[in-house]
Amino acid sequence: MKKVKKILILAVLMLFSNNTMGANNATIYDHSLIDIDGNSIDLSIFKGKPLLLVNTASRCGFTPQYEGLQKLFTEYRKTDLTIIATTSNSFNQEYSSTEEIKKICLANYGVGFITSSPISVKGEDAHPIYKWINKEYSKKPKWNFYKFLFDRDGLLVDSWSSMTKPSSKKITNKIDKLI
């Protein structure tokens, strides 16, 4: 009887640990986005590369950070670093038209990194990427230009608020360790 009990307990523990492990194996690379031109981007194409994800808006006091992101993109262009800006009106500071957003990104800041079409980054309407970040890491953008850095395995390394500029040593030192 004791042997049967032990086997049952062991079986339940194994079942529980398998379910838990499966739930935590997700990475940033298990997601996809629609870019500013309407093309689907499967983030799995960036597997093995560090990725900086930034929620952005065109009518925000932090919008000039596009310039800093572009400088970062240019500086790290020959490395594996991928930069993705997810445009969002979650804080009521983004245009509704992708054409207007493109004009700001391209004409004003010469953005060359990947930019998504507008998505939600908070609440029930949040894009699955941001729901995943919140669920797995208890992190979510509190404002525009929150930055999330993922390692080559697609796991979150660090995140920074809008107040941290893209050129900050806090960010570049972490990137340098990943590339």
Regions found by a protein language model. Give the residues of each.
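Thiol-/selenol-based redox modules, centered on thioredoxin-like
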Residues: K131, K135-I179
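Sec-dependent N-terminal signal peptides
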Residues: I7-F16
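Conserved helix-turn-beta segment immediately C-terminal to the redox Cys motif
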Residues: K49-P50, R59, P64-T87, L106-Y109
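Amphipathic alpha-helical repeat scaffolds
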Residues: D35, N55-R59
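Short, internal strand/loop/helix patches
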Residues: E99-N144
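N-terminal "domain-start" segment that seeds a small globular fold
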Residues: M21-S44
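Positively charged n-region of N-terminal signal peptides that target proteins for export
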Residues: M1-K6
